Amino acid sequence: ELALGRGGDQVVIKNNEKISFFGGNTRELEKRTRVRARVIAQALRELIFESSNILIMGHKNPDMDAFGASVGLWSAIRQLGKSCNIIIDNDINAIDYYMNKLKSDSKYDNLLISSSEAEKAINDKTLLIIVDVHNKGYVSNLNIAEKINRKIIIDHHRRSPDIIEGALLNYIEVYASSTSEMVTELIQYMLQKPRISKIEAEGLLGGIFMDTKGFQFKSGV
């Protein structure tokens, strides 16, 4: 399962607690199908409707892919009529410019909350969506990730042995260029008529641009 989650072109050997990987060095080519994205989107949509509130969290020191994907999901969830917030604790240089654009629009006044505010909002029906990370050591706030029972992981990095446990959905797609690309695809299946604003689209595009190194890496169709 771990080998398949990392792309399938490798062997995994576990010796006691030590895990070694052999292979997995081939160039990652497009192997995804839209069927899986459609199924995941439908499952995600149902979980959102079953939730009292939704929190979104990325990795430590979030970059444009993590934050752009978060904003895209936030927009889709709000269009489904549910309460949603993105957990951000500190000002991050990598996303300062985009963050300031969001802050200049009153639509996004309640977009962000701190970890301490998020902990107060947690209840049995809270759903946590973890984006652009699945490793316990890199998630923004492991305490929150472990405290919330209902959680989903959306990520494009090769699967780590130290994965956050207990997720209702693990959507880890190593052939995607970025988490922002994955979220963009999910949105079109989550909503009948998506209404993504210019600034939200810029965030998703910025995430894809960053992780493809200016559309030079993993940008084939």
Located regions from the model:
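Residues in the short beta-alpha loop(s) of Rossmann-like NAD(P)-binding domains
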Residues: 17, 90-92, 157
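A structured phosphate/pyrophosphate-recognition subdomain
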Residues: 5, 38-62, 71-82, 161-221
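C-di-GMP signaling machinery
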Residues: 16-51
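Short acidic, glycine/serine/threonine-rich loops at helix termini
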Residues: 22-26, 67-69, 97-100, 141-143, ...
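Active-site cofactor/cluster-binding pocket
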Residues: 112-166
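Anionic-ligand anchoring segments at beta-strand to alpha-helix junctions in alpha/beta enzyme folds, i.e.
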Residues: 51-122
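Catalytic/regulatory signature loops of cyclic-dinucleotide turnover enzymes
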Residues: 2-20
